[in-house]
Amino acid sequence: VYKRQHMYSYIFPQIYQSENATRDTHPALFGITKILKVEAMHRVTDYYGPIIYKNFADAGKHYRPDTQKEVYYEFFNELDSAVVALTSYVEANPESNGFSRFDILLDGRYSSWIKFANSLRMRLAMRISAVEPDKACVEFQEGLNNEYGVFEAETERVAVSTKSGYTNPLGELNLVWNETYMSASMESILTGYDLSLIHI
């Protein structure tokens, strides 16, 4: 429940504001926002099933939740929008690297974000392959055949860079707040198997 509350209290409102602020004036940032939105929210629907997605901030529709099928279809639509926006921007501004100073996930190139979108599309297609194989096949091929490609090498990954001094917030929770504990399940496993790790 905490994950869902956190998402709707802090993350989704920022995404919503970013979409509205960039839609007509900053197409590349709009595309990146869409990708991050899908990346963040697909985990939420996989945990909870139906979620408020298309009707977020729409009081007129009473914030009606979408079915998981509707959410996944919207994910693919939003990745379409992201790829179109980024591709158009890259083709019109091939030397642009204005985002590189702020990109702490990838290498600062807009083309890498298109790769991310394509790879994410393939991942989501695999998630629905057992229940909607035809849709999954279409979406998988869409990502695979995009001219900008997909992540193939181990070095091509989305990870938070610590070069600018950014540190993992779990370090703050553990070292400063002193609120990170072993779970009861983990303790039972270590104790049950009489593993020496329990004494470290």
Where in the sequence are the language-model features?
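Structured, solvent-exposed acidic/aromatic patches
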Residues: 3-198
